[in-house]
Amino acid sequence: VVPWNAQMFLTATKLAPALAAGCTIIIKASEIAPCSLLYFARLIKEAGIPDGVVSIITGDEKNCAIPLTTHPDIDRIAFTGGPKVAKQIVINSSENFAVTTLELGGKSPIVVFEDADIEGAVNGIIAGNYGASGQSCVAGTRVIVHDSIKKVLVEMLSKRAESIVTGDPKNNETHVGPLCTNKQINLIEKTLKKAKSQGAKIVFGGSRLNQKGYYFEPTLIDCPNESIVSLETEMFGPVASLLTFKDEKQAIKMANNTKYGLGSGLFTNNLARAHRVSKKIKAGICWINSYRAISPIAPFGGYNQSGYAREAGIDSINDYIRTKTTWINISNEPMK
């Protein structure tokens, strides 16, 4: 079961190990944006995969997802999406004890230490928050910066933000495209309004663009404390929230102050610190001096309400096979 964002990558991480293990697969496309996978069905046919090995279906939760996840012939369910739907899938799958892999949301931290290459950190923050219009489960939406470098980092981020072009993704000059639904924009606006009432300040952005389509400005919110609503709400849009810290211990505590645990990023030139802090951050992925790099050979998945199990990497095939112990008596001697 795949969402509407990053459909081909998320399908591939599920389909490849399943095919390698000799399984037949049903892919449930998002009802919001099914066209990519419907076209992919043609490519499956052209590739020579026999009919019935891979099926792609579309439909809503009631008519498609629920019948699939409760069907007795379904042995395994791999889901990418939100925690609310995931909890229902776990309940549904318990009817038949189907094995599940859940890759859910996140409020990933990007921690920038005082010894970091600030330009590199700015690149990571831009890519981690405004790439794909912020519609990414690993978006680094909690930017946690040492207080001694906050001013210069914010200045560099603001300058870079001025050069970001938001518009039609078919135009070559566009950097940030539209959001998928108006519902996302409404959630962003509601969250920003609440954050400002709690004392947060908009550094740049913060508004819906006055043009046709679901466009929202790349946005940075300066948060005075960790209770600001934008630090806990997954908005799935181009919005980052900024916090400052004074020492390493506080940075780790801030990074782990979330119910999620999918991605994380560290920017530092101290290799010992990078290893030390990455071990203490409760997240399934940690990028050091980079952000949002993905490879099919690297395991992908999270902790806590970001889900469990892993996709991609050699271990992913283990979820699609079963271990069987077979004892064979090759002796003609009577059983003792």
Predicted regions and their residues:
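ALDH superfamily catalytic-core signature
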Residues: 84-225, 288, 335-336
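Rossmann-like NAD(P) dinucleotide-binding subdomain of oxidoreductase/dehydrogenase enzymes
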Residues: 1-120, 245
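Structural detector of well-ordered beta-strand residues that form the stable sheet scaffold
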Residues: 19, 26, 55, 78, ...
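Residue-level signal for inorganic ion chemistry
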Residues: 22, 54, 77, 106, ...
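Short glycine-enriched loop/turn motifs at secondary-structure junctions
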Residues: 51, 104-106, 137-138, 172-173, ...
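Gly/Ser/Thr-rich beta-alpha loop segments that engage phosphate groups in nucleotides
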Residues: 24, 32, 61, 83-84, ...
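Conserved C-terminal structural/oligomerization subdomain of aldehyde/semialdehyde dehydrogenase
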Residues: 74, 111, 165, 198, ...
